[in-house]
From Swiss-Prot:
PANTHER family on file: BICD FAMILY-LIKE CARGO ADAPTER (PTHR32123), BICD FAMILY-LIKE CARGO ADAPTER 2-RELATED (PTHR32123:SF11)
Protein name per UniProt: BICD family-like cargo adapter 2
Gene coding for it: BICDL2
Organism, as annotated: Homo sapiens (Human)
GO biological process: Golgi to secretory granule transport; vesicle transport along microtubule
Keywords: Coiled coil
Biased composition regions of type Basic and acidic residues, renumbered to the chain: 135-149
């Protein structure tokens, strides 16, 4: 891949422009070797150039090592962040499970307390009934004793005539006791009216609780709809992943084509290198007074063979036996590597970190809704506890039965709510797992895309080197006739002009 700030492509003899030696920033060694190549500079300066080149290569290697180290540190940091996020998620899940377990234990304890209280109330009712039976038996015994006393009084009327005043006093006392009993009956009637009002208030509270239950059911339905929406978003994420995989396959096919073209270019380069070595051997065997025209014809013939070998990479190049003007007029502009290897046209709109943040926000919203539902459930439990305390103070059996039925209904509702909360938590966990899988897949795709970009850069660099080699060969062929034959050399070893092609082949 290339960027707008990447290396420019200077125009050479093959593209209809000036000589490649005019681009001082792209190939600095051309200016450094111009004098030695043309035979005008002294020879001892070449070791210094080689030392500078070696230092530059060492600097490049150090920079590459530092870059690799930075990439490894960045990978390690991302891995640590992922581990911390997973640990936080596990800790939050354990805390939620522990709170749910504590709520269940509290509910079971409250149910056991209510059952124990109901058993105590039943025991109190049985004790009161026993006391009432004892009082009735005592009243019957007192009635029998009164009848016996009356019989004794009738039999002993004469004897008890002196006690008539005492009997009248006793009658007055009994009258007062009767009035007290009547007052107690009226108080019991008032208490019954109060009980009826309390029952009506409890019925109203029961209706209010039913309305709250309906509200909770509506909230649960809303949660289910949100879960369905989350599943829809997850489905869209899967579709995006499938699209990315399809694009990755297309990019891999393009990469294979580019690699095949690069292999052909390398094979052509090797053939050209062998041809240059052959020409070098021939030049060693030839006489030093060979004319410049014969040497130019041989070099043109070798370049013609190299162009025929690289026909697949540059189909628009013409034979090098033509003059520079003819090449400028006839050779078409070579297609740059950016047109051959296009970058991926579509990228994901959001990075994996942003998608993770969005999913964490959704999970936090779900947790807030669950906490609100738990708070409402706690308030309902408190209201039920208050109702239990109020009903525990009532003695009639009907109130007790109604309290037991309300208790059972409230317990059933609490169990249903706990089951629904468990289902919501399970769905949330499944969504979080799907989210983690999607993030891992996206990270893998991103790494593959980066590797593909690196491969493309390598292929583009190879194509640029091959193109630069052809331009330099053409410039060398055009500048050769103006110099004497003994000063021209294609040697790959040490010498006044042997380092140019050797450095070029060493770079490729």
């Amino acid at each position: 891949m290339s960027s707008p700030d990447g290396p420019s492509f200077p125009s050479g003899p093959l593209s209809g422009g000036a000589s490649p030696s005019g681009d001082e920033g792209f190939f600095p060694f051309v200016l450094e070797r111009r004098d030695s190549f043309l035979g005008g500079g002294p020879g001892p300066e070449e070791p210094e150039d080689l030392a500078l080149q070696l230092q530059q290569k060492e600097k490049d290697l150090l920079l590459a090592a530092e870059l690799g180290k930075m990439l490894l540190e960045r990978n390690e940091e991302l891995r640590r962040q992922l581990e911390t996020l997973s640990a936080q998620h596990l800790e939050r899940e354990e805390r939620l499970q522990q709170e749910n377990h504590e709520l269940r234990r509290g509910l079971a304890a409250r149910g056991a307390e209510w059952e124990a209280r109901a058993v105590e109330l039943e025991g109190d009712v049985e004790a009161l009934r026993a006391q009432l039976g004892e009082q009735r038996s005592e009243q019957q015994d007192s009635g029998r004793e009164r009848a016996r006393a009356l019989s004794e009084l009738s039999e002993q009327n004469l004897r008890l005539s002196q006690q008539l005043a005492q009997a009248s006093q006793t009658e007055q006392e009994l009258q007062r006791e009767l009035d007290a009993l009547r007052g107690q009956c009226q108080a019991q009637a008032l208490a019954g009216a109060e009980l009826r009002t309390r029952l009506e208030s409890l019925q109203g509270e029961n209706q209010m609780l039913q309305s709250r239950r309906q509200d909770l059911e509506a909230q649960i339905r809303g949660l289910r709809e949100e879960v369905e929406k989350g599943e829809g978003r997850l489905q869209t994420t899967h579709e995006e992943l499938l699209l990315l995989r399809r694009e990755r396959r297309e990019h891999s096919l393009e990469l294979e084509r580019a690699r095949s073209e690069a292999g052909e270019a390398l094979s052509a380069l090797r053939r050209l290198q062998r041809r240059v070595s052959e020409l070098e051997e021939e030049s060693r065997l030839q006489d030093a007074d060979v004319s410049a025209a014969s040497l130019q014809s041989e070099l043109a013939h070798s370049l013609d063979d190299g162009d025929q070998g690289q026909g697949a990479d540059a189909p628009g190049d013409t034979p090098t036996t033509r003059s520079p003007k003819t090449r400028k007029a006839s050779s078409p502009q070579p297609s740059p590597p950016e047109e051959i290897l296009e970058p991926p046209k579509k990228r994901t709109s959001l990075s994996p970190a942003e998608i993770l943040e969005e999913k964490e926000v959704e999970v936090a919203k779900l947790q807030d809704e669950i906490s609100l539902q738990q708070a409402e459930l706690q308030s309902l439990r408190e209201e039920l506890q208050r109702q239990k305390e109020l009903r525990a103070q009532e003695d009639p059996g009907e109130a007790l039965h109604s309290a037991l039925s309300d208790r059972d209904e409230a317990v059933n509702k609490a169990l249903e709510l706990s089951l629904q909360l468990n289902r919501v938590s399970l769905e949330r966990d499944s969504l979080s797992r799907e989210l983690l899988r999607a993030i891992r897949q996206k990270v893998a795709l991103t790494q593959e895309l980066e590797a593909w970009q690196d491969d493309m850069q390598v292929v583009i660099g190879q194509q640029l080197r091959s193109q630069r080699q052809k331009e330099l060969s053409a410039s060398a062929s055009s500048s050769t006739p103006r110099r004497a034959a003994p000063r021209f050399s294609l040697r790959l070893g040490p010498g006044p002009a042997g380092g140019f092609l050797s450095n070029l082949f060493r770079r490729t």
